[in-house]
Amino acid sequence: MGKEKNPRRVGENEAFAKVKMLRTSPQKLNLVAALIRGKKVDKAIADLTFSKKRISQDVLKCLQSAIANAENNHGLDVDELVVSEAFCGKNLVMKRGRPRARGRFGKIMKPFSELTIKVKQVGETA
């Protein structure tokens, strides 16, 4: 009479990975997330590897984690995986300051983001 098992948050042919506290703004992170959205995972890995954006290496780590979760935890075939969703959200904003002229103080906002990547196994028709 133990506690009931939590239902899966994703479908049977899906897996996801989530990264929190990425030190970039959500607007900049969404540019890289849009780069891989809807692509096959091998093409997405190639795009992220050669991207010039600084945050693309962190997005690549999250994508590789989602692929590993799909393979090891859910038994999905890696060759048939597609990035079904890649979205980001706002996390905390560190507020810092800088002394300015005439005794004033300028606000500097240092935003953090979070990223969720969901991969889905599709058939040969993808």
From Swiss-Prot:
Look up the domain of life of the source: Bacteria
Entries under InterPro entries matching the protein: Ribosomal_uL22 (IPR001063), Ribosomal_uL22_bac/chlpt-type (IPR005727), Ribosomal_uL22_bac/org-type (IPR047867), Ribosomal_uL22_sf (IPR036394)
* Keyword annotations of the record: Ribonucleoprotein, Ribosomal protein, RNA-binding, rRNA-binding
GO biological process: what's one of them? translation
Any one GO CC term of this protein is: cytosolic large ribosomal subunit
Output the Gene3D superfamilies linked to this UniProt entry: Ribosomal protein L22/L17
Example of a GO MF term? structural constituent of ribosome
Q: Which CDD domains match?
A: Ribosomal_L22
The answer, when asked if Metal-binding is one of the entry's keywords, is no
Query: One Pfam annotation, family name?
Result: Ribosomal_L22
What family does this belong to? Belongs to the universal ribosomal protein uL22 family.
What does the UniProt function comment say about this protein? This protein binds specifically to 23S rRNA; its binding is stimulated by other ribosomal proteins, e.g. L4, L17, and L20. It is important during the early stages of 50S assembly. It makes multiple contacts with different domains of the 23S rRNA in the assembled 50S subunit and ribosome. The globular domain of the protein is located near the polypeptide exit tunnel on the outside of the subunit, while an extended beta-hairpin is found that lines the wall of the exit tunnel in the center of the 70S ribosome.
Q: How does it assemble?
A: Part of the 50S ribosomal subunit.
Protein name (record): Large ribosomal subunit protein uL22
Which organism is this protein's natural source? Cereibacter sphaeroides (strain ATCC 17023 / DSM 158 / JCM 6121 / CCUG 31486 / LMG 2827 / NBRC 12203 / NCIMB 8253 / ATH 2.4.1.) (Rhodobacter sphaeroides)
Q: Which gene encodes it?
A: rplV
